[in-house]
């Protein structure tokens, strides 16, 4: 099919004029003056891969596909790893019937037939192959042409449709934007049409079978060539990776310091077992005991050690089935070894080193028995989940067992950065409307079971699994369910429809499990398995590197369990480029845990979590990708909105994890240092208000007690100042710990010398009001009546009598100083890069109260009095606060809503009852002339009851385009004003705000 009509002789129509004006400005930004504000959508751009900056060629291609009316692609190479992350987007285009033409080539016979077949199966796509052998010419094009109405956007450069090219390789591409009459776009489209209509461009049915056969022969030859040097391949495999090298180095230091215990915390699939084997070899241990909790894991560990030691030491198994006690290296199950008769076969000091695999089990009694008996030179614990335990007893934790000596810690995100794991393509897919069983009646559970195992659900799972596919010659998948009866019924129905599945549970024998895994991991045969279905036994420990598809059919219990189950597919293996993860997302209240698990962000900041759902694919390291379909995305947003991240249970759990890791009560700075929950969640909790109050209520070891007034002062600083959004008050408090008089003068001098920051009269007045409880609204003034830090002294201020009395208490001073230092640290990291001459930082988030304070208002204003904006005459500042919550029918209602036109253009509506002559409207329109400073604050979700924060987007200037109108369904007028942002909104923030 030919989808793009020639229109080269057309003249510009009147409808094109707005596009032309916008395009001209964008071209000026790109080619003449980068400081010119223009629309990113019309701007030529350099397109490359850099996940740390939120940039991937893949994201650019996806964005254009989702926005276009039609597309054409010409690339030399297409692989499954390249099209898999695009499959969800391509499916959406098929539903919308967006036509596409894709031209590839048989150049070097590199394109994968399976990928070509997958593309051709999409009803909206026509695929052709350019035969370079017949044409007797090379073919190395890499171009992506997207058309929307009269505008072309074309990405052209170095990127084929392969995983490496689209996600992490150093790639150089240019995105050009042109009208359909532009010379460059016209030439590119003509070139594509010429190739597409050439006699050498073969239809799919013409080329596919012969190309597939030829590809198969050549691939076999390549595979044989790879096997020519087996020795060098094995040697390469046995070189320690970056994690293992770092771990051995640190372990040596721990030993040299005289410590006898150490813990390795490492993400599933990063090679913990090999790390321990390399460590035993490098540190020269002669007798080693390797403890596991399953026979199968003991066998796998022995196999890994055998590769590292190559027969230099004898190795044996001590399990229910094997009794090979007298070997140098023993691989034993805890169940067998902890029996008295087996334990006492060995002397206490028989082993130089004892390694405990899945060490989060070591708090159990069976392990305690072994830990109490043996006296090796080194105890080494290994786990991916140190915070997961077999008991809930206070004080019995893994960190404590290993003396809080962490030899190395590498979590999922770190492991992906280091390329230690197999890339994954995660797809969040809408499941049926199933409600979790927890708290349901038996009748409701029966009804739920019918849904879980319904024909509709079975067919949907099979359809999605087939569409999204796998890497390799055949599927080798794991399916996680929430119930054993569900697993059995699903297996029965899957098998009836042609899948080969088997259910494994805790009741199955080791032999049955081993046999099932062999059938799954092996090559195609009569008794091969496509999937093993499980509830929990594959969450940890079992190593099946060949797994190339993971299907999750259960609610996310916790980020820990999610990562464990995801991790089953993340081990690297021969002929496995990536693993496909299909997560069927129902209406579960814990859905918010999915982005927390994938991002590794444990701050529990709602807006950060929302942004990861929409933008995570841009920032995830390496070739991995993340996609959610529209409904599953909404379900996660709903779960985030409903969650209370300042809930005391969540706070206590995160606190306990950090305390366990450290072995003592954490300092405030430890929460940031170890990436635990943002301590501001503690301050936000209304029953707490401060870390001090939390410790008093929930930490038995904490014995400090302050007076009620002292406690209130600590709460005030925690809630109002400790976030570090401004340095002034924090450094003022720091001065009061040293000086009692001349506080403001000393503060001004210190800020000028250390921060190059000057305090004008408005700022000085605001800081004084803040520290004398005069800034607060009446309700807050009453709550914090004791929080008066300063008193007037001639031409300066000294500390107040009440506060001075508090400073006589050394315990109060210590808590105050820690809190102030924490706030200063936060300021330096997050809030020190001010926008122009303000106290604000672009793209940081601020509440109404923050804005009033940082704009140096004399008094705070309650949000109700501010509404969408408020003018402060004294400072001549005029902040605008916008709740950006786009509706589904946006095209019909934009003229009555605040909305972005481009990254540097905003349409905002005045308050109702306003006309062109209203004072606030005139102040907006004449702001520059009147010396009024208009600042823009925008928030995505006004229903977030916890943060209530707005992104700060800088200064705005009214363009002069304004019109008065009557608001729908009322007799009141309002004024629509167009604003220009001095700084166009950063791409990732803009996309997050404007997209649903």
Predicted regions and their residues:
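PLD/PLD-like phosphodiesterase catalytic module centered on the HKD motif
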Residues: 1-241, 245
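Long, largely alpha-helical accessory region at the distal end of helicase-like NTP-driven motors
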Residues: 214-240, 466-467, 471-472, 597-730, ...
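Walker A/P-loop
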Residues: 256-280, 294
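Conserved helicase ATPase core of P-loop NTP-dependent helicases/translocases
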Residues: 299, 317, 322-323, 342, ...
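Post-DEXD/H (motif II) to motif III coupling segment of the RecA-like Helicase ATP-binding lobe
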Residues: 361-425
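Conserved interdomain linker/interface between the two RecA-like ATPase lobes of SF2 helicase motors
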Residues: 404-478
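Conserved segment of the helicase C-terminal RecA-like domain
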Residues: 559-564, 568-598
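Acidic, glycine-rich low-complexity segments with interspersed aromatic residues
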Residues: 713-717, 726-732, 839-949
């Amino acid at each position: 099919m030919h989808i793009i009509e020639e229109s080269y002789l057309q003249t510009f129509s009147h409808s094109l004029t707005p596009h032309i004006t916008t395009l001209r400005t964008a071209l000026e930004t790109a080619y003449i003056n980068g400081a010119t504000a223009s629309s990113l959508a019309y701007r030529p751009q350099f397109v490359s891969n850099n996940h740390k900056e939120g940039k991937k060629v893949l994201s650019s291609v996806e964005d254009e596909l989702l926005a276009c009316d039609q597309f054409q692609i010409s690339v030399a190479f297409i692989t499954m790893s390249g099209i898999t992350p695009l499959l969800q987007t391509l499916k959406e285009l098929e539903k919308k019937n967006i036509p596409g033409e894709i031209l590839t080539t048989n150049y070097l016979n590199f394109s994968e037939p399976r990928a070509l077949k997958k593309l051709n199966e999409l009803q909206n796509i026509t695929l052709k192959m350019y035969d370079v052998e017949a044409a007797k010419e090379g073919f190395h094009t890499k171009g992506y042409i997207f058309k929307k109405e009269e505008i072309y956007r074309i990405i052209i450069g170095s990127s084929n449709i392969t995983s490496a090219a689209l996600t992490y390789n150093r790639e150089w591409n240019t995105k050009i934007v042109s009208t359909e009459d532009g010379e460059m776009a016209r030439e590119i489209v003509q070139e594509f049409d010429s190739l597409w209509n050439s006699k050498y461009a073969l239809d799919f049915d013409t080329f596919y079978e012969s190309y597939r056969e030829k590809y198969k022969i050549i691939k076999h030859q390549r595979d044989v060539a790879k096997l020519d040097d087996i020795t060098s391949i094995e040697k390469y495999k046995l070189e320690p990776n970056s994690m293992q090298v770092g771990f051995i180095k640190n372990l040596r230091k721990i030993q040299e310091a005289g410590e006898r215990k150490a813990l390795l915390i490492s993400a599933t699939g990063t090679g913990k077992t090999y790390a321990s084997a390399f460590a035993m070899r490098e540190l020269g241990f002669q007798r080693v005991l390797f403890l596991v909790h399953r026979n199968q894991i003991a066998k796998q560990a022995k196999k890994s050690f055998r590769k590292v030691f190559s027969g230099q030491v004898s190795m044996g198994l001590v399990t229910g089935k094997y009794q090979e006690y007298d070997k140098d290296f023993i691989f034993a199950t805890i169940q067998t070894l902890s029996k008295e008769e087996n334990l006492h076969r060995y002397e206490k000091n028989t082993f130089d080193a004892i390694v405990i695999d899945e060490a989060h089990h070591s708090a159990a009694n069976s392990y305690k028995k072994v830990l109490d008996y043996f006296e090796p030179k080194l105890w080494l614990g290994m786990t991916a989940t140190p915070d997961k335990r077999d008991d809930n007893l206070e004080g019995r934790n893994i960190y404590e067992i290993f003396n809080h000596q962490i030899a190395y810690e590498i979590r999922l995100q770190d492991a992906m950065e280091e390329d230690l794991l197999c890339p994954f393509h995660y797809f969040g897919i809408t499941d049926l409307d199933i409600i979790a069983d927890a708290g349901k009646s038996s009748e409701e559970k029966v009804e739920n079971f019918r849904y879980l195992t319904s024909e509709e659900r079975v067919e949907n799972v099979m359809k999605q699994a087939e569409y999204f596919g796998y890497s390799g010659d055949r599927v080798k998948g794991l399916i996680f369910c929430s119930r054993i009866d569900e697993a059995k019924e699903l297996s029965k129905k899957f098998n009836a429809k042609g899948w080969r599945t088997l259910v494994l549970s805790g009741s199955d024998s080791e032999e049955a499990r081993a046999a099932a895994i062999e059938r799954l991991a092996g090559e195609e045969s009569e008794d091969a398995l496509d999937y093993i279905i499980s509830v929990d036994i594959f969450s940890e420990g079992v190593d099946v590197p060949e797994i190339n598809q993971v299907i999750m059919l259960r609610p996310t219990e916790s980020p820990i369990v999610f990562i464990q189950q995801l991790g089953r597919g993340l081990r690297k293996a021969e002929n496995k480029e990536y693993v496909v993860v299909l997560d069927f997302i129902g209406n579960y209240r814990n859905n918010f845990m999915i982005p927390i698990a994938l991002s590794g962000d444990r701050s529990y900041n709602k807006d950060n979590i929302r942004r990861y759902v929409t933008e995570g694919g841009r920032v995830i390291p390496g070739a991995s990708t993340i996609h959610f379909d529209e409904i599953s995305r909404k379900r996660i947003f709903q779960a985030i909105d409903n969650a209370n991240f300042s809930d005391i249970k969540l706070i206590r759990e995160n606190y306990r994890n950090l305390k366990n890791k450290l072995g003592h009560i954490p300092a405030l700075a430890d929460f940031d240092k170890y990436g635990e929950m943002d301590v501001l969640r503690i301050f936000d909790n209304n029953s707490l208000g401060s870390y001090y109050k939390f410790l008093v209520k929930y930490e038995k070891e904490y014995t400090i007690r302050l007076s009620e007034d002292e406690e209130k002062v600590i709460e005030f600083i925690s809630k109002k100042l400790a976030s570090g959004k401004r340095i002034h008050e924090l450094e003022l408090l720091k001065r009061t710990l040293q000086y009692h008089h001349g506080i403001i003068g000393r503060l001004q001098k210190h800020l000028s010398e250390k921060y190059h920051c000057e305090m004008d009269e408005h700022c000085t007045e605001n800081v004084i009001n803040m520290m004398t409880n005069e800034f607060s609204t009446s309700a807050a003034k009453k709550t914090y009546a004791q929080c008066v830090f300063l008193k007037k002294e001639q031409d300066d201020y000294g500390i107040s009598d009440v506060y001075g009395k508090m400073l006589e208490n050394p315990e109060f001073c210590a808590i105050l100083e820690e809190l102030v230092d924490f706030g200063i640290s936060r300021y330096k990291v997050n809030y020190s890069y001010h926008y122009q001459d303000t106290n604000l930082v672009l793209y940081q988030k601020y509440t109404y109260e923050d804005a009033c304070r940082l704009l140096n208002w004399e008094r705070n204003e309650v949000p109700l009095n501010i509404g969408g904006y408020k003018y402060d005459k004294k400072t001549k500042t005029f902040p605008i606060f916008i709740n950006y919550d786009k509706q589904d029918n946006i095209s019909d209602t934009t003229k009555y809503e605040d909305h972005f036109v481009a990254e540097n253009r905003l349409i905002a509506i005045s308050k109702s009852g306003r006309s062109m002559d209203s004072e606030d409207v005139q102040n907006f329109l004449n702001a520059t002339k009147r010396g009024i400073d208009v600042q823009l604050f925008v928030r995505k979700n006004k229903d977030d009851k916890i943060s209530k924060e707005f992104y700060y987007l800088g200064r705005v200037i009214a363009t002069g385009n304004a019109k008065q109108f009557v608001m729908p369904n009322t007799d009141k007028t309002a004024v629509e004003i167009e604003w220009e942002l001095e700084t166009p909104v950063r791409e990732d923030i803009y996309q997050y705000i404007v997209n649903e």
